[in-house]
Design a protein with these regions (language model features):
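Polytopic alpha-helical membrane proteins, predominantly small-molecule transporters/carriers
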Residues: 1-283
Length: 283
């Protein structure tokens, strides 16, 4: 359980760092780029992927490149959502991206749906709608629309990443290989984009990005390790991770960033947690 707790804490610390960094004048895109630099190195050292025997012709490079483009884009949307919608709503939306992944598994991979899984998906979608509509109550119309857009982007974006990862692994590539390659491509593409934009490089963004990458990778590594150690209890890992991230996100939003828990947000939170429990029971 300590691994799940630590993984969830690292996940929320990523969001807290991004939110604080923006307020202190850091460049989110530079941070995201350097985050993938350290994540690539750590992924190679931790998971030890067999990159030497990759088949150049058989590897779906287009998928790796797409993932390399999507990852930093979604990370940037996450940073924007944290600023406009807040950490509380953003963490819930990110965690509930799993319901879209499950719907994709049903339609694309012919995965069977039980009544519990269907209930979890329905509750999850309803929860996200509550979060989006609760954003409509903001007095700032422009901030309001941006918050709704970025919340939706986070929800859909993380689901797309999950779907692409599942599809890539279904083609026979090992997860450590995919993870390392997509981190490398995400770093390269992010750096190229920043050079094209003639970005003013600052050492503080590099340092913050490396810290971001350390937390981001720790979240992934600890979560994978928890699944390995608790391989006979995947529901505990799934439910524990998602519920703890949501709860930590709520606590951070309320006590660190002084966000308000509106009625619709509270309803979304309750429905989201209920959805996670249903999905965990369905595993």
């Amino acid at each position: 359980m300590e691994l799940i707790f630590s993984a969830a804490l690292c996940s929320v610390l990523v969001s807290i760092l991004l939110k604080f960094a923006k307020n202190k004048g850091f460049d989110a895109l530079q941070m995201i780029a350097w985050n993938y630099a350290i994540a690539s190195i750590l992924s190679y050292l931790w998971f030890k992927p067999d990159l030497a025997h990759i088949s150049v012709s058989a590897t779906p490079w287009w998928l790796i490149i797409v993932l390399g483009m999507v990852l930093p884009s979604i990370f940037l949307c996450l940073a924007k959502s944290l600023q406009t919608a807040g950490i509380l709503k953003t963490e819930i939306a990110q965690r509930l991206s799993v319901v879209l992944s499950l719907l994709a598994a049903y339609f694309l991979f012919q995965e069977q749906f039980s009544q519990l899984k269907m209930a979890g998906v329905t509750l999850g979608i309803t929860a996200v709608l509550c979060l989006i509509f609760s954003q409509a109550g903001s007095s700032n119309t422009n901030l309001n629309r941006k918050g709704m857009l970025f919340l939706l982007s986070v929800w859909v974006g993380y689901a797309i990443v999950d779907i692409l990862l599942k599809y890539t692994t279904s083609l026979g590539l090992q997860f450590p290989v995919i993870l390392t390659l997509m981190f490398i491509f995400a770093f390269i593409l992010s750096i190229v984009y920043l050079f094209i934009q003639k970005t003013q490089w600052k050492i503080k963004n590099v340092i913050a990005g490396l810290l971001l990458g350390l937390l981001n990778f720790a979240n992934i590594a600890l979560y994978v390790k928890a699944h390995i150690l608790l391989k006979d209890s995947p529901a505990i890992v799934f439910a524990g991770m998602n519920i703890l991230v949501v709860l930590f996100g709520v606590l951070a939003g309320l006590f660190i960033f002084k966000e308000k828990l509106k009625k619709m947000t509270t309803l979304g939170l309750v429905l989201g947690l209920a959805g996670v429990v249903c999905l965990a029971l369905a595993i």
